[in-house]
């Protein structure tokens, strides 16, 4: 069943299916840029018979719409997984390596081994699976767009949940991103244990 979505948005997956790939996995991250908290990644293999209406790049959706789509994607997926890498590891291995690690962990936690992985951005090093990297892939691939929503909602929920542990920073409002208010609070109170120290060098110097 296809529900009101541009056909070219699923064209990549359709072509891969014709080439014989059965389990097509979309992978995306959330939280590369924030000053605090973990980076998340999601991997998902969607049912090719069901296209969920309204799936797009998660950054272009309202939080309410993302939450609704999250539940639909979870329900209609063949298998999905979400992984995170914490701020301390980000500081140790850098954000690029941390993002790739989260992506690999998410893929490896799937209940099925993908035939091919579609990844937003750049190829994942040492993946040992066929993969295709797409710049701005969440705008070009339905599977990546679904993964984008899973990663974004999962991270937002996590940050909102732990915000009560650090109330002065108001993480529930900015989700760790470098807003003017967040930077002001860092300068006033100093960083807390979930801040990425490697991201604060220019702010705290």
Curated annotation (Swiss-Prot):
<comment type="function">
    <text>Endonuclease that specifically degrades the RNA of RNA-DNA hybrids.</text>
</comment>
<dbReference type="InterPro" id="IPR001352">
    <property type="entry name" value="RNase_HII/HIII"/>
</dbReference>
<feature type="binding site">
    <location>
        <position position="29"/>
    </location>
    <ligand>
        <name>a divalent metal cation</name>
    </ligand>
</feature>
<dbReference type="InterPro" id="IPR024567">
    <property type="entry name" value="RNase_HII/HIII_dom"/>
</dbReference>
<dbReference type="GO" id="GO:0004523">
    <property type="term" value="F:RNA-DNA hybrid ribonuclease activity"/>
</dbReference>
<feature type="binding site">
    <location>
        <position position="120"/>
    </location>
    <ligand>
        <name>a divalent metal cation</name>
    </ligand>
</feature>
<dbReference type="GO" id="GO:0005737">
    <property type="term" value="C:cytoplasm"/>
</dbReference>
<dbReference type="GO" id="GO:0032299">
    <property type="term" value="C:ribonuclease H2 complex"/>
</dbReference>
<protein>
    <recommendedName>
        <fullName>Ribonuclease HII</fullName>
        <ecNumber>3.1.26.4</ecNumber>
    </recommendedName>
</protein>
<keyword id="KW-0540">Nuclease</keyword>
<keyword id="KW-0255">Endonuclease</keyword>
<dbReference type="GO" id="GO:0030145">
    <property type="term" value="F:manganese ion binding"/>
</dbReference>
<feature type="domain" description="RNase H type-2">
    <location>
        <begin position="22"/>
        <end position="205"/>
    </location>
</feature>
<dbReference type="InterPro" id="IPR012337">
    <property type="entry name" value="RNaseH-like_sf"/>
</dbReference>
<keyword id="KW-0378">Hydrolase</keyword>
<comment type="similarity">
    <text>Belongs to the RNase HII family.</text>
</comment>
<dbReference type="InterPro" id="IPR022898">
    <property type="entry name" value="RNase_HII"/>
</dbReference>
<dbReference type="Pfam" id="PF01351">
    <property type="entry name" value="RNase_HII"/>
</dbReference>
<keyword id="KW-0479">Metal-binding</keyword>
<dbReference type="GO" id="GO:0006298">
    <property type="term" value="P:mismatch repair"/>
</dbReference>
<dbReference type="GO" id="GO:0043137">
    <property type="term" value="P:DNA replication, removal of RNA primer"/>
</dbReference>
<keyword id="KW-0963">Cytoplasm</keyword>
<keyword id="KW-0464">Manganese</keyword>
<dbReference type="InterPro" id="IPR036397">
    <property type="entry name" value="RNaseH_sf"/>
</dbReference>
<dbReference type="GO" id="GO:0003723">
    <property type="term" value="F:RNA binding"/>
</dbReference>
<feature type="binding site">
    <location>
        <position position="28"/>
    </location>
    <ligand>
        <name>a divalent metal cation</name>
    </ligand>
</feature>
């Amino acid at each position: 069943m296809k529900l009101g979505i541009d056909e070219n948005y699923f064209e990549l997956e359709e072509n891969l299916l014709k080439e014989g790939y059965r389990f097509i996995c979309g992978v995306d991250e959330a939280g590369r840029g924030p000053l605090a908290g973990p980076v998340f990644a999601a991997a998902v293999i969607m049912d090719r018979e069901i296209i969920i209406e309204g799936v797009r790049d998660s950054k272009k959706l309202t939080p309410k719409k993302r939450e609704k789509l999250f539940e639909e994607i979870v329900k209609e997926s063949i298998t999905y997984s979400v992984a995170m890498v914490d701020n301390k590891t980000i500081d140790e291995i850098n954000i690029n390596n941390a993002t790739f690690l989260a992506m690999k962990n998410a893929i490896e936690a799937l209940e099925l081994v993908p035939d091919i992985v579609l990844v937003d951005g750049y190829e994942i090093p040492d993946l040992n699976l066929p993969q295709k990297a797409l710049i701005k892939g969440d705008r070009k691939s339905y599977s990546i767009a679904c993964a984008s929503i899973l990663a974004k909602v999962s991270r937002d929920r996590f940050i909102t949940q732990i915000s009560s542990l650090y109330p002065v920073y108001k993480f529930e409002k900015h989700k760790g991103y470098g807003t003017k208010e967040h930077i002001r609070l860092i300068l006033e109170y100093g960083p807390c244990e979930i801040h990425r120290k490697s991201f604060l060098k220019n702010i705290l110097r």
